Amino acid sequence: MTVKEKRRGRPKGENSQLNAQTILDTAKLMMREESKIPSIRKLATQLNIDAMAIYHYFDNKNALLEAITTSLIEDIYEPQVGTIENNWQQELTLLSKSYLTLLGTYPGLLETLLSMSSTSPAHVFSERFQLVLQPLNLKEDDIKNALDLLADYLHGYALALNCQSAEPALNIDSISGPLKLYCLALENC
């Protein structure tokens, strides 16, 4: 009987350079395939390294989780500064649809975001949202309330998209009407 020798530490060889970005990219790919954040052990197995090597780049599992989710959220639509003044409604729609697309691509992401204690991923969306609303010159409280309302709506909509049957009645484009009403309310704030 032979015993398989366990690989420890960082991978050896020119073709297998381990770094934080490689870990994040692999974790995001696994998350897309498995609909949940992969365990450290599964991630290490996929990377063909010992699990402890991941802790060289991330202090703990929560730091890795924050890095993964923040990296995913950073991929959503970034409002175009030059077009916000005249087309803030369109920019808000593009931001919202991009966020829903991300949540649909990574089905376990919504639950992960809502259960996290870190606010880094939410901060990314919040900054982009506030940039879109700059032309309205809203009060700080109104911006916070508008953000809370939109985030709750988008999270509920993403949940509905993930829970619908094989013949979908909802799609991402279906938010256009409700978003127009939302924008009208913001203009009259």
Features from the language model and the residues they span:
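C-terminal peripheral helix-coil segments that are non-catalytic and often amphipathic
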Residues: M1-R7, C163-C189
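Helix-turn-helix
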Residues: T22, T26-A63, A67
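Short hydrophobic clusters on alpha-helical segments that form packing/core surfaces
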Residues: I23-M31, L72, Y99, L103
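Amphipathic alpha-helical segments used for helix-helix packing
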Residues: T69, K97-E127, L159-C163
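Short, basic, alpha-helical segments at the C-terminal edge of helix-turn-helix-like DNA-binding modules
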Residues: T70-Y77
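Hydrophobic alpha-helical connector segments
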Residues: E78-G108, L150
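Hydrophobic alpha-helical bundle segments that form small-molecule/ligand-binding pockets
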Residues: V124-E167, L186-C189
